[in-house]
UniProtKB/Swiss-Prot annotation:
Protein's GO biological process: peptide biosynthetic process
Alphabetical list of SUPFAM superfamilies matching this protein: Nucleic acid-binding proteins (SSF50249), Translation proteins SH3-like domain (SSF50104)
GO CC, one annotated term: cytoplasm
Gene that this polypeptide is encoded by: efp
Keyword annotations of the record: Cytoplasm, Elongation factor, Protein biosynthesis
GO molecular-function terms, A-Z: translation elongation factor activity
SMART domains: EFP, Elong-fact-P_C
Name of the protein: Elongation factor P
Family the entry assigns: Belongs to the elongation factor P family.
Function: Involved in peptide bond synthesis. Stimulates efficient translation and peptide-bond synthesis on native or reconstituted 70S ribosomes in vitro. Probably functions indirectly by altering the affinity of the ribosome for aminoacyl-tRNA, thus increasing their reactivity as acceptors for peptidyl transferase.
Source organism: Bacillus cereus (strain ATCC 14579 / DSM 31 / CCUG 7414 / JCM 2152 / NBRC 15305 / NCIMB 9373 / NCTC 2599 / NRRL B-3711)
Disulfide cysteine pairs (residue numbers): none
Pathway noted in the entry: Protein biosynthesis; polypeptide chain elongation
Subcellular location as annotated: Cytoplasm
């Protein structure tokens, strides 16, 4: 059992006989009444996203998920193919199962496949990934105001805000948890 006060992004829990992954959470302390935790959860079996509210201090069951190291090979229509590096076994995951992770996946990338009692649930990404900028506006010389950003489209289709000095073709390090620019690669 784990307290909802200990929620963190990516945590897997079992609530109402379903497996959920915490996508987002917020501790709320209203001026009047008891504190609570508002969370956004994704059902690992169906891919549906739900918002649930828990009382502060409420206990939920932590799901023990096993991670298998695999390599992302390619997309085949709606299916995405992964290969176990040790056994060369290939598995296919549907687009709905890995919808959020698709923005960060590149061919031949090493990832962890989450399984629960032999059932494949989804993909766990590394904390950061290197992606190439495919489209962005050119930076304007002399624009030195602090924290000036512009949108940049990356090779996977992900759009992130980057500093004004970033140009097309550059490799960037992106935080997969927040989907934000970290630095140049």
């Amino acid at each position: 059992m784990i307290s909802v006060n200990d929620f963190r992004t990516g945590l897997t829990i079992s609530v109402d006989n379903a497996l959920w992954q915490v996508l987002d959470f917020q501790h709320v302390k209203p001026g009047k009444g008891a504190a609570f935790v508002r969370s956004k959860l994704r059902n690992l079996r169906t891919g549906s996203v739900q918002e649930k509210t828990f009382r502060a201090g409420e206990k939920v069951e932590k799901a023990h998920i096993e991670n298998r190291r695999m390599q992302y090979l390619y997309a085949s229509g709606e299916a995405h193919v992964f290969m176990d590096n040790g056994t060369y076994e290939q598995i296919e995951l549907g687009e709905k199962q890995i919808e959020r992770e698709l923005k960060f996946l590149k061919e031949n990338m090493e990832v962890a496949i989450m399984t629960y009692q032999g059932e494949v649930l989804g993909v766990e990404l590394p904390n950061t990934v290197e992606l190439q900028v495919t489209e962005t506006e050119p930076g304007i010389k002399g624009d030195t105001a602090s924290n000036v950003t512009k949108p940049a489209t990356l090779e996977t289709g992900l759009v992130v805000q980057v500093p004004i000095f970033i140009n097309e073709g550059e490799m960037l390090i992106i935080n997969t948890g927040e989907g934000k620019y970290v630095s140049r690669a």
